[in-house]
A protein has these predicted regions:
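Class I SAM-dependent methyltransferase SAM/SAH-binding core
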Residues: 46-100
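Conserved class I S-adenosyl-L-methionine
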Residues: 1-40, 54-58, 75-78, 85-86, 141-166, ...
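A short glycine-rich, Lys/Arg-flanked "PGG" loop and its adjoining helix->strand segment in the class I
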Residues: 124-139
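A short acidic, Gly/Pro-enriched loop at the edge of an enzyme's catalytic core
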Residues: 99-110
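A short SAM/SAH-binding and catalytic strip from SAM-dependent methyltransferases
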Residues: 109-122
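Conserved Class I S-adenosyl-L-methionine
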Residues: 52, 186-252
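Short alpha-helix
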Residues: 168-182
């Protein structure tokens, strides 16, 4: 046994694939997040569950320094390579837990997490941790898959079938409620939709495996109402659907 949990195991194997993901590197949600955060040249940023570092490097040109933390060493290795190859000097990457960072109170001006919170064991605990390390009036920036009300059970089902480390994706209203309970005030909230083909959604999992079979079976059993809500192109088999992500910025 290597002692790794489901998240480390999944992303350790697929780190290289995420480095090549155009959606992660250039998704509309990333530009929306950076714009909504309004980063300043003197600010320090903590990017939680940084993965291969796309969010950290997108923010780096606008701030003093970005620290990216992640539980998966292989993802951090990819992030360091991308930063080096891109000449991004004001970023650093280290192992760290989203729900229990080592940083002191009031350390950061901005805390971000993008496309990762659905892997967190305890999202409210992460939000409390973000609140702790943020300075007064600091901003929290979140991007995560966020299914429409009424589709969350199905969306979480297929995400878990694709990736066993997926825990839960929350609706926009659930996110706003959790953020408020942690002490933040939401300043910006927008849902960004991306029409994804089955193949693009499954990536970096390869076609033809047990994951594809299980997910296609789930789609066949899905309610027609769910397919309509997700804007699914469905004729005998699902071809594409709209994957929704919330972009949320809140202030301490």
């Amino acid at each position: 046994m290597d002692g790794k949990g489901p998240t480390e195991s999944f992303f350790g194997v697929h780190a290289g694939g995420y480095t090549k993901s155009q959606s992660h590197a250039h998704g509309e949600d990333l530009a929306t997040l950076v714009d909504a955060l309004k980063p300043k040249p003197t600010e320090l940023v903590l990017d939680v569950a940084t993965g291969t570092g796309f969010t950290a490097m997108a923010l780096a040109p606008y701030v003093s320094h970005v620290t990216g933390i992640d539980v998966t060493a292989e993802m951090l290795d990819e992030a360091r390579k991308l930063a080096h190859n891109g000449g991004v000097l004001n970023v650093s990457f280290e192992l760290g837990d989203a729900q229990a960072t080592k940083f002191a109170d009031w350390t950061y001006d901005i805390v971000t997490t993008r496309r990762a919170a659905h892997h967190f064991q305890d999202v409210p605990r992460f939000l409390r941790e973000a609140y702790r390390v943020l300075r007064p009036k600091g901003r929290l920036g979140i991007v995560d898959m966020s299914p429409p009300e009424g589709t969350e059970a199905f969306c979480n089902q297929i995400e878990r079938l694709r990736d066993g480390s997926h825990i839960e994706a929350f609706t926009p209203n659930a996110w706003k409620s959790m953020v408020a309970e942690a002490g933040f005030q939401t300043q910006f909230s927008e849902v960004v939709g991306e029409q994804v083909t089955f193949e693009r959604w499954l990536y970096p999992i390869e076609l033809g495996g047990k994951e594809e079979v299980a997910v296609r079976t789930a789609w066949r059993s899905a309610r027609q109402e769910t397919r309509l809500q997700l804007n699914a192109d469905y004729s005998n088999e699902v071809k594409s659907w709209t994957k929704s992500r919330i972009v949320l910025v809140a202030v301490k």
